[in-house]
Amino acid sequence: MLKKMPMSNKFENFYTLRQVSEVDKKPCFICYKPTKWVLITKTKLDFFYVCYNHLQDRGFATPISVIKSVTNKIDTNKLEAKDESKNVEKDATGNPQESKQEPNLEVQQTEKEKDVDSASAENESINSSSSSSKECSTQTQSKHYNLHRDIFQMRIRYHANRAAAEKTARLLQSGQGLPSPPSKPLP
């Protein structure tokens, strides 16, 4: 059975993409090919090298801008639904003043729909361009990423194992990790 690791307070699942020079390339965390892309936390406690192609994989990391755009679309859809329900309630009450404002609301709704359509068209163009381009470009679409929960747990486990190994090495060097000889003489 898998042992659940407690979430560490010192790590946050918010990574910034940085680029190092060609001389400082190190192996990728996933495929061990030399890469110049580094994901690093705000606190700089955790960093690792990763190929740019892995960042495109939704099973590895999700760009923060994509998460925000999805939540914004959900919020706008909820607001539109509320506006429509208010319009239905206004029609039921039959207030003449509110019926004069209805054409303006319809114009606003069509403008919102156009904005949503243009945003979805932009997302489709981004998705098609990212899937069609196979080589790494120097311009990145997003500089901030959230790791997939399993990858993030791997990073936490890596640091926990590293801390345990350092503690064991310290105890062995100081001699406190070994049992002491008996203080009483043997019979």
Curated annotation (Swiss-Prot):
Q: Which GO terms describe its cellular component?
A: cytosol; endosome; nucleus
Q: Where is the composition biased (Low complexity)?
A: 118-142
Pfam families found in the cross-reference section: Vfa1
Q: Which domain of life is it from?
A: Eukaryota
Annotated Basic and acidic residues bias: 81-92, 99-117
Region described as Disordered: spans on this chain = 81-142, 165-187
Which BP terms does GO give this entry?
late endosome to vacuole transport; vacuolar transport
Q: Which family does it belong to?
A: Belongs to the UPF0589 family.
Q: What is this protein called?
A: UPF0589 protein C32H8.01c
